């Protein structure tokens, strides 16, 4: 029975599925990430209205160029996130505020133009997981790097750090950390598309080490400039 269950899950990952599409500008949504989105494009609002009458599942995929108003298949990245709508609020100006939760990584296949919105064929993607001990060690290192970064970068709330420290799954830990790091959209998407959890953790650890180093250099420069200014003022 156990083997049958594993095979069933594996096969499901290779089944072509279909959902309405919501193209995103300037944000990458990771699995387990809960985030509010403000939606204004007609096709996107129609897609949301459609899924609210069914199972509330929608496919989120980031645009390569946020300036494009009516994106085609080549205008979005190759991987997105199967997500669920937690809450939807229609605003007075005609736009929509929606609270979404990322669920699973998905490979984007084809766009299907409906009358009022876009649907998308896709396949779910599995994480590539190595030995548990190695992943747990890397997860602990990643959390320590995040603690250090949080102590010098006030843009990351302490509540975020505490919620990540409560996580047990290395894949979820890597995704939650990546979603809060200061990276370009293409850099974030590259980490999103890293299905090997060990490599994903390695990547975010390097990003955090680099960001910590940059912040340290900036602080030292500001300190030297401040000291020089104070010295100049004393001389006058």
Give the residues covered by each predicted segment.
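N-terminal low-complexity, acidic/polar interaction/targeting segments
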Residues: 6-236
């Amino acid at each position: 029975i156990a083997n049958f269950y594993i095979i069933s899950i594996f096969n499901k990952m290779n089944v072509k599925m279909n959902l309405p599409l919501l193209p995103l500008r300037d944000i990458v949504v990771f699995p387990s990430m809960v985030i509010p989105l403000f939606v204004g494009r007609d096709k996107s609002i129609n897609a949301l209205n459609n899924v609210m009458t069914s199972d509330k599942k929608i496919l989120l995929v980031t645009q390569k160029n946020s300036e494009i108003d009516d994106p085609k298949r080549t205008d979005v990245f190759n991987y997105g996130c199967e997500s669920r709508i937690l809450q939807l609020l229609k605003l007075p100006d005609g736009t929509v505020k929606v609270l979404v939760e990322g669920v699973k990584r998905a490979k984007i296949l084809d766009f299907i133009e409906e009358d009022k919105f876009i649907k998308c064929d896709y396949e779910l993607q599995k994480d590539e997981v190595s030995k548990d001990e190695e992943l747990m060690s890397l997860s602990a290192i990643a959390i320590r790097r995040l603690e250090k970064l949080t102590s010098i970068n006030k843009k990351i709330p302490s509540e975020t750090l505490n919620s990540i420290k409560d996580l047990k799954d290395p894949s979820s830990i890597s995704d939650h950390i990546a979603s809060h790091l200061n990276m370009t959209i293409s850099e974030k998407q590259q980490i999103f598309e890293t299905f090997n959890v060990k490599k994903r953790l390695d990547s975010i650890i390097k990003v955090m080490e680099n960001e910590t180093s940059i912040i340290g250099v900036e602080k030292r420069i500001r300190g030297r400039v401040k000291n020089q200014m104070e010295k100049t003022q004393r001389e006058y």
